[in-house]
Design a protein with these regions (language model features):
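ATP-dependent carboxylate activation and anion-phosphoryl transfer catalytic cores
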Residues: 1, 10, 33-36, 46, ...
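A conserved helix-loop-beta module that forms one wall/lid of the active-site cleft
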Residues: 1-50
Length: 223
């Protein structure tokens, strides 16, 4: 895809992946991607239909079920980085290429649990400086390459001190209001002014305040 081409051009690592539209295509892909695999439908929200499979039988069953429930959908199949730590970064960017990272969060659950369902800490509690620098560098490179104006959220998988890109969303993420509240900074206000062209990122004086850690927890409505 175009995004993987961009990551290759930027020399940023990402898990091996492929796209399938049938169980037959999925099993053929599995030979080159290697198990375990993360299977998910495209163009859905909230991790709907996402599952980790460990063999061809599980893969075929899940693909058949997905295509029954969401007919005509293309399935994204990634090599699952077993044992990886998931992290994410949010940033504000302007048309001049200025990028300010408002927060980096580390997920407590293993990589593969959807970000909306996971607990996370701000700032990260278990990522070394080498990993943190990779996250910052990748975030700035991707934000500029996508010519982002406003907010961007990028999700990462960290394994053996290598930071892989899971996905990038050039939009406001669910984590932005959490980070803004934790740091006591009006990030949404800043980003809106940047998007409208009223200000550049460099016009603002950022002064985040946080003692200790802030913990993001999912809230589930049960009726």
């Amino acid at each position: 895809g175009r995004f993987s081409d961009l990551l290759t051009e930027l020399n940023i690592p990402f898990p091996k992946f492929g796209i399938a539209e049938s169980a037959e295509e999925a099993t053929l892909l599995a030979d080159s991607l290697d198990f375990p695999l993360l299977v998910r439908p495209s163009y859905v929200l909230g991790g709907q239909g996402m599952k980790i499979v460990i063999n061809k039988q599980e893969l075929e069953e899940h693909v058949i079920n997905l295509l029954k429930s969401i007919p005509g959908n293309k399935l994204l199949i990634d090599h699952y980085l077993d044992g990886a730590i998931e992290a994410e970064a949010d940033a504000i960017c302007d048309a001049d290429g200025n990028v300010y990272i408002i927060g980096i969060m580390e997920h407590i659950e293993p990589c593969g649990v959807h970000s909306g369902d996971s607990n996370a800490t701000l700032p990260p509690f278990n990522l070394g400086e080498f990993v943190m620098q990779q996250i910052k560098d990748h975030t700035e490179k991707i934000a500029r390459a996508l010519q982002t104006v406003g907010l961007i959220n990028i999700q990462f998988a960290v394994k053996n001190d290598i930071v892989y890109i899971i996905e990038a969303n050039p939009r406001a993420s669910r984590t932005v209001p959490f980070i803004a509240k934790a740091y006591g900074e009006p990030y949404v206000n800043y980003a809106t002014k940047v998007m409208l062209g009223h200000n550049k990122v460099t016009d603002f004086t950022f002064n985040p305040q946080l003692k200790g850690y802030a913990i993001k927890q999912p809230v589930v409505s049960i009726s």
